[in-house]
Amino acid sequence: RERRAPMPLAEGRVRCRTPLGARDGIAARNLLGAILNEGGLARDAIGRIQVRDSFSLVELPEDGLERLLGKLKDTRVGGKQLKLRRYRED
């Protein structure tokens, strides 16, 4: 399957990755709800959410990212740990 180039990021946002994806029964709304509820962000602070088969990508504000990831450290979605990390494209 052909790899798609990621969409360009809006200024001030970074892409984060979770190992949860469609195979885990995860939908974008599940990730959105968890990040809004546990992270305390406003809806407009969260950018594009891309759910792939075996992982998902979420665009989040770069400012305060480490604090946000700390808040989400123990968050579970669909009974599985979110494990959200900053995504570095190689």
Task: Locate the predicted segments by residue.
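Terminal-proximal interaction/regulatory segments of ATP-powered molecular machines
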Residues: R3-D90
